[in-house]
């Protein structure tokens, strides 16, 4: 699951993923993070 700090970051992440890039690369580019669980930390719920 990916967790992003803002809607803008989420949009960047989603657009990056559409290009076929990996989750880790897109998370790094957008400022989002990949977690192993199912619930994002407070403030990372985008």
From Swiss-Prot:
Q: Where in the cell is it found?
A: Secreted
- Please name the GO terms that the record assigns under molecular function: toxin activity
The protein's UniProt keywords, in alphabetical order, are: Disulfide bond, Plant defense, Secreted, Toxin
Query: Record's InterPro entries?
Result: Thionin, Thionin-like_sf
Query: What intrachain disulfides are recorded?
Result: 3-40, 4-32, 16-26
Q: Please provide the Gene Ontology terms (biological process) for this protein.
A: defense response
A GO cellular component entry from the record: extracellular region
Write out the coiled-coil annotation as residue ranges. none
* Record-linked Pfam families: Thionin
Q: Say which family it is in.
A: Belongs to the plant thionin (TC 1.C.44) family.
Q: List, alphabetically, the PANTHER family matched.
A: THIONIN-2.1-RELATED
Q: What does this protein do?
A: Thionins are small plant proteins which are toxic to animal cells. They seem to exert their toxic effect at the level of the cell membrane. Their precise function is not known.
Q: Specify the protein name.
A: Ligatoxin-B
Instruction: Please name the source species.
Output: Phoradendron liga
